[in-house]
Amino acid sequence: MERRWVFVLLDVLCVLVASLPFIILTLVNAPYKRGFYCGDDSIRYPYRPDTITHGLMAGVIITATVVLVSSGEAYLVYTDRLYSRSDFNNYVAAIYKVLGTFLFGAAVSQSLTDLAKYMIGRLRPSFLAVCDPDWSRVNCSGYVQVEVCRGSPANVTEARLSFYSGHSSFGMYCMLFLALYVQARLCWKWARLLRPTVQFFLVAFAIYVGYTRVSDNKHHWSDVLVGLLQGALVACLTVCYVSDFFKSRPPQSCQENEESERKPSLSLTLTLGDRP
């Protein structure tokens, strides 16, 4: 029992270590102060509020995760398709494994995103509207790198975090992780259309979030594209190399279940083969 708790503490420690970069960078909140050219039209767009706010995005992700994971693991444990040698309750152990893996991948994804944001400091499309430069101090004949912003310091700092999109990377990570979870867990014949339908809406939400970041003038299209790719990459690597979703036991993979349903038994094969 004590050994099991050591493993739990080790898992928690790993998640915390993976979270350190984005925690530290967020607390310091000092991105690279990149300058600009007066004639740069890519940062002259008007400021617009978020279509998908942080609260709305968190609500959708948390709801989808709780509903899919809790119901999926409950059904598999109840039907004895999923079991654990843990000292804890089978359902608790199953939920712990999925959520622990999910949180670890989320920490990695967010840390990678914030490293790029704070180290590169790319200006958002609405930077000049947020900055509100004091043009009397600006020499437009060259590269402007002096501090000339009259806008809110907090908003100006936020306007320096364009590359790459955190909404896109985190949204794609979470939704693709859940889509792969559904692929691994929802593997019965009656779910052949239900499974891709659920996966479509999960991934479509992540892509929609990315589109809104461009239309809201929060990110350049390349910021969103890189964010989506990074989120997808981290989700795939986490599911393939950290989780046990596609291991044969537990649970049985979809391929094994389907093959066992399609293939005739050994005795039936031999009987048919002996006929003249």
Curated annotation (Swiss-Prot):
Location(s), subcellular: Membrane; Cell membrane; Early endosome membrane; Endoplasmic reticulum membrane
Known regulation of activity: Magnesium-independent phospholipid phosphatase. Insensitive to N-ethylmaleimide.
Principal place of residence: membrane
Chain spans, region Phosphatase sequence motif I: 117-125
Residues covered by region (Phosphatase sequence motif II): 164-167
Glycosylation sites: 139, 155
Stretches of the chain found on the membrane's Cytoplasmic side: 1-4, 73-87, 183-189, 247-276
Metabolic or biological pathway, per its Swiss-Prot or TrEMBL entry: Lipid metabolism; phospholipid metabolism
Top EC class for this record: hydrolase
GO biological process: ceramide metabolic process; phospholipid dephosphorylation; phospholipid metabolic process; regulation of cell cycle G1/S phase transition; signal transduction; sphingosine metabolic process
Substrates-to-products reaction catalysed: a 1,2-diacyl-sn-glycero-3-phosphate + H2O = a 1,2-diacyl-sn-glycerol + phosphate; 1,2-dihexadecanoyl-sn-glycero-3-phosphate + H2O = 1,2-dihexadecanoyl-sn-glycerol + phosphate; 1,2-di-(9Z-octadecenoyl)-sn-glycero-3-phosphate + H2O = 1,2-di-(9Z-octadecenoyl)-sn-glycerol + phosphate; a monoacyl-sn-glycero-3-phosphate + H2O = a monoacylglycerol + phosphate
Phosphatase sequence motif III as annotated region, ranges: 212-223
Pfam family membership, one: PAP2
GO CC terms, sorted: caveola; early endosome; early endosome membrane; endoplasmic reticulum; endoplasmic reticulum membrane; membrane; plasma membrane
UniProt-annotated catalytic positions: 167 (proton donors), 219 (nucleophile)
EC number: 3.1.3.-, 3.1.3.4
Topology feature Lumenal, residues: 26-51, 109-161, 211-225
Membrane disposition: Multi-pass membrane protein
Tissues expressing the protein: Expressed in the brain.
Annotated GO MF terms: ceramide-1-phosphate phosphatase activity; phosphatidate phosphatase activity; sphingosine-1-phosphate phosphatase activity
Residues the record marks as site: Stabilizes the active site histidine for nucleophilic attack: 223
PTM summary: N-glycosylated.
Membrane-traversing stretches: 5-25, 52-72, 88-108, 162-182, 190-210, 226-246
Similarity section: Belongs to the PA-phosphatase related phosphoesterase family.
Subunit (UniProt): Forms functional homodimers and homooligomers. Can also form heterooligomers with PLPP1 and PLPP3.
Protein name: Phospholipid phosphatase 2
Classification lineage: Eukaryota, Metazoa, Chordata, Craniata, Vertebrata
